[in-house]
From Swiss-Prot:
TM region(s), chain numbering: 4-21
Function: Essential cell division protein. May link together the upstream cell division proteins, which are predominantly cytoplasmic, with the downstream cell division proteins, which are predominantly periplasmic.
Topological domains, Periplasmic: 22-91
Sequence ranges on the Cytoplasmic membrane side: 1-3
GO cellular component: cell division site; cell septum; plasma membrane
Cystines in this chain: none
Protein name as it appears in the record: Cell division protein FtsB
Pfam family, one: DivIC
Gene Ontology BP terms: FtsZ-dependent cytokinesis
Family under the similarity heading: Belongs to the FtsB family.
InterPro entries per the UniProt record, alphabetical: Cell_div_FtsB, FtsL/DivIC
Entry keyword set: Cell cycle, Cell division, Cell inner membrane, Cell membrane, Coiled coil, Membrane, Transmembrane, Transmembrane helix
């Protein structure tokens, strides 16, 4: 009576090995699912960044307002008869 139980236990272990640890097993599926989730988050972040850059490019192509704004903010340029005042930030 003891040998059939041992044989069945060994058989169950042998049959379960590919399910849990083999190629396409649960551990591999879990790892692939985790990587898929990370990649989707990265894709979402990059899509948002691309949308912002696309909007900025369209603004720069369509009119002078965006160019003027960047020139004022980044280069400190002013219009004729305009005074530029810079207020230092408190630390």
């Amino acid at each position: 009576m003891r040998w059939p139980v041992i044989i069945l236990a060994v058989l169950v272990v042998v049959l379960q090995y590919p399910l849990w640890l083999g190629k396409g097993g649960w551990l591999r599926v879990w790892e692939v699912d985790r990587k898929l989730h990370e990649q989707r988050e990265e894709n979402t972040r990059l899509e948002e960044r691309n949308a912002g850059l696309d909007a900025e490019v369209r603004d720069l192509k369509s009119g002078n307002e965006a160019i003027e704004e960047r020139a004022r903010l980044e280069l400190g340029l002013t219009k004729p008869n305009e005074i530029f005042v810079q207020v230092p930030q408190k630390h």
